[in-house]
Every structure is written in structure tokens, then in C-alpha cells.
Amino acid sequence: MKINIPENAKKVINQLNNSAFEAYAVGGCVRNAMMGIEPHDWDICTSAKPDEMERVFKDYETHDFGLKHGTLTVMSGGEAFEVTTYRIDGAYSDNRHPEQVTFTDDLTLDLSRRDFTCNAMAYNDKDGVIDPFGGAEDIKKGILRCVGDPDKRFNEDALRILRGLRFASTCGFDIEKSTAQSIHKNAALLNNIAYERIRSELTGLLRGEAVCKILTEFRNVIAVFIPEIKPTFDFPQHTKHHVYDVWQHIVHSIDSVEQNDILRMTMLLHDLGKPQACTTDKNGCNHFKGHQQISAELAEKILKRLRFPNEFSETCLKLILWHDERCSGSKKQIKRLLNNIGEENTRLLFKVQRADTAAQSEYLRAEKFASIDLAERQTEEILAENQCFNLKSLEVNGSDIKALGVKEGRAIGELLNKLLDDVIEERVPNDKGALLRLAQKYISK
């Protein structure tokens, strides 16, 4: 198979080859190229030792911050390429990093330390694909398989557990039986991994086309670092609005929303409070009053634990809190929604509600979708016509109220909000004169 290596990467490989060293593109770039995906990064492995690499690239701009592990960053044509000496990893005491590395001249030994067969391939134009572990065949069959002993691979670096789930989710691969068994067996090792790294892999996993399958088959793995999901497993909903238990509803809702990180994380967390909120009536029907607030409280802890950025978390929490707010064709409700969560979040909320509805039963589904469509159209009308829905669009401001003799800041704010409420409820037009007259009446009372 011919892989088109970019000229800047080829230049680095040729520089090593011309100096009598082996050099290959390796790992994810080879995998992606074989799958027809444009690689973002081209990593290079070589038989040259670190000091030899420095000599080979003495006329290049280089960065040596990874040199003790055998990695030299080489600048070629304005691009950075990581060039790493073939190596064998020593013992892993922290389930993340080897205590030491030993350099080798053997490419196969270097490839043998890698995580999955699809990532254990190398390529250059002269030798073609070097594939000692059958990675190309596994890619062709859509199989994710560890290189060698899965238990050993996951004990070396526990993050590989989540990385494997991400690959399976994004590439649609089936996880080979012994690899899958080892993932379940070693899931607790994820407790040794930094939450920032877990966050990155989880986000990628949620973005995948096969997310529904992975979250169903490997839910206990996710529960290692998000134990709050456990109560939703197999928790029945017993209502005509639902056909799935709570966890399966969550999973199908993720699969039903676009591949946007905020939206997919929101769907993962939006109903976690249902088991706590559940009550059962005399007819055996479950109700989940207040589950939005409980879900948001649980979500806040999870997002903080996984070190999500504040802005990302705030958006998720607003969407979770308001995900069951149905506007029922009322522009007044929509204006209150816009005032509470803002324009962009309101648009996102409708996407959340569509995904939520898609993961429910067929009972009134068409009517629910129609209601969301109507609310969306009315929202755009309100925005296009610059209708008043917040203090910013109110025709009076704090200075106007202060001029009427109200001096205390809190009282000014309360009066402005009262006027806004009157405008939204259409008791008074959004006209400065009318609002000032009404404000004067409130002050005089």
C-alpha cells in the first residue's frame, strides 16, 4: 500500500535515511492514512540514538525537551515533527509512565510496546508498511486488538483503557474479546489517571458514531470515574413517555444529538437525578419531579472533578436545569427563557429537547417535535424583531430610575425587573415614556 507522506515529514525521514539510519512514519498517522483519514500529526521513529539524531539535524531547528525519553522535535518547513528512537519501555509503577526506557535497533521491539495493533505499524516509501502484529488486517475487519497481552498493556498505561473505547466509538471498531475482557477487568486502574486526561478521552468517546454501543457495553468502565451514573443502570421509568430505562434513555439521547461536545456532555448528565427524584403513584407510574435540579447538582460535581473549563460547565448546567422547560407556543415563556439562559443557550436547549424526545417512546412524539419547532420559530421571530426579553433591551435603565429619586442599587434593580416583567407579560409597551410613568406609580405606592 502506498501512503502519501507530506513533503516536510518525508524530508525528515530522508535526512535520517541518508545518514544511514532507519526511519519511518509510525503509529496513528499510518493508521489514519490506511483508513482514508487525513493525519493531523506525523510521528517518526528511527534507529538513530538521541545523540545521533542531534548530529543528523544539526542544521535544523530542534527542541530537545523529550530527549531523555528519546524524542527530538525537528522543525521542517515550519512544521514540528517528533522523532523518537526505537525503544523498549521499562516497568510502569504508576500505570502511566515507564520508570526507564532502553533504546534498541529493532523496529519490531519498538512496535511491540504500543497499545493496539492498528497503532503498531510503520511506513516509509522504500519498505512500505511494516506490520508485525496484523494491524492492517484488524483495520480491514474493523477490530480493535491489543498488541500482545491486554492485561500487560493496560497495566502499563491505564489510560489505554479509555483510549481503546474512544477508538472503538469514533472508528466504529468492535473490541476483540480478550481486549474487551481485560478492559472490564482492569477498569479500576483508571483511578490512577489524572482527571484532565480522562476528560480528554471521554470527550472524544462521546463524539463517536458508535457511542451508543460503547456506553452500553462498557458502562461500568465509565462508572469508575463517574460513579453518579450507576443508579441509572437498569432503573425503570414506568411511564408511557419512555421505552428505555434511565441509562439507556441517556445513551440514546447522546446518540440523537449532533457531535458537539457541550451537547453530548449535557445529554450524558441531564437525567442523572431521576433515581433520586423518583416517586411511584398508585397506578405504578413513575414521576421524576425536580430531577432537573438534582441532575444539575450531580453534574456540577462531575464537571468540576473532570476539570472542565468554567464556561463549558456553566453552559451544560443551564441546559440541564432547563431541559424540561417546554414553551408550548407561548412567546411570553420564550422571552423568560431567553432572559434566563440567553440566545445561544436557548438555541442549544432546543437541540437538547429534540434529542431527549428522540430517545423517548413514540407517545406524543410528533406533537413534542412540533412544539419544539414552533418554539424555535417564535424565538427567531423575537430576536429578528428585537422584541424586549431582558434588561439590556428594556427602554429604561438604572440611570432613568435613579433620576426618579430611587438611589439604592438593589431597589433600582428590583424596579427594573418588575418593569421587564410587565413588558414580557404585555401589561405595558416597551416605551420609555410609558415605562417611566409606570415606574413612578410603583415608587409612589
Go through each PLM region and give its residues.
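Catalytic cores of the polymerase beta-like nucleotidyltransferase superfamily
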Residues: 1-445
